Amino acid sequence: MPAAYAITVQVSQLLKDGYMEAVDIKQLESFDAGCLFAQAEGIIPAPESCHAIAATIREANKCKETGEEKVILFNLSGHGLIDMASYDKYLSGDLVNYELTDADIQKNLDEIGNLA
């Protein structure tokens, strides 16, 4: 099993134990954040990193509103040079937010159950 899959158990446990929280970041918000980061830092972030950047921006804005001072840490997992097609779609307005419906999720879970 690749290490990336093994880490999900640890992350899930940290979430369950209250050491971290999960947030919902839509695709367009994540690319907004990625482009802002690229303009500010000169690094085009990988799309998966853009979600962390967006959550960091949200948290920083909350601190700005409340006056709270805190250290905010995020993980930049890599550059986005391999996935420039996604940035091209975003910048040309062709990228949309997509959400699975509950029915889609249930259908996929049912199919996974049939694999056992």
Task: Please name every model-derived segment.
Residues 25, 46-48, 75-77:
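Generic beta-strand/beta-sheet core signal
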Residues 55-116:
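Catalytic phosphate/nucleotide-handling subdomain of diverse soluble enzymes
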Residues 1-43, 89-116:
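Active-site/ligand-binding loops adjacent to catalytic centers
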